[in-house]
Amino acid sequence: MVDSKKRPGKDLDRIDRNILNELQKDGRISNVELSKRVGLSPTPCLERVRRLERQGFIQGYTALLNPHYLDASLLVFVEITLNRGAPDVFEQFNSAVQKLEEIQECHLVSGDFDYLLKTRVPDMSAYRKLLGETLLRLPGVNDTRTYVVMEEVKQSNRLVIKTR
């Protein structure tokens, strides 16, 4: 986690921000094309990309896959409430959930429950199995609430990067 007081993004200039915006749009863009779009020659552009990678602004590159083509059509969000009787229940839960490939995201949140999970499964029977055989058996789980997504209205991994 980055210390919010240091705010490393403040040191990015307009070109760095443009590079990040272009890479968010297309992570497979060639360095030559990227350099044209941000107004640099290829060598300094590549040097900036490598620096942004070293500094942690760019954490990696991935392919966006179509879940409907890959037997993962059902998107489900799950609220998890833990039994807070055990002193290390949060650490145990965190460790256990890291091992579950079916869980795409897990967030510790404030409010009436402790965690919000995002999972994708083939269908409702697969989710029922995941819930009954896995999620309810995670360390400290006291209660769950399930929200089945009926329609994905918007999905994006892009961050808003102001170019100043």
Swiss-Prot record:
Cellular compartments per GO CC: cytosol
Molecular-function GO term, any one: sequence-specific DNA binding
Residues in the DNA-binding region annotation: 31-50
Domain of life where this protein originates: Bacteria
Keyword Metal-binding annotated: no
Transcription regulation among keywords: yes
Signal sequence range: none
Pfam family, one: AsnC_trans_reg
Keywords assigned by UniProt, alphabetized: Activator, DNA-binding, Transcription, Transcription regulation
CDD domains given in the database record: HTH_ARSR (cd00090)
Residues in HTH asnC-type domain copies: 12-73
A biological process from GO: alanine catabolic process
NCBIfam families reported for this sequence: PRK11169.1
Subunit record text: Homodimer.
Protein function: Mediates a global response to leucine. Exogenous leucine affects the expression of a number of different operons; lrp mediates this effect for at least some of these operons. For example it is regulator of the branched-chain amino acid transport genes.
Name listed for the protein in its UniProt record: Leucine-responsive regulatory protein
Species for this entry: Klebsiella pneumoniae
Lineage: Bacteria, Pseudomonadati, Pseudomonadota, Gammaproteobacteria, Enterobacterales
Gene name in the database record: lrp
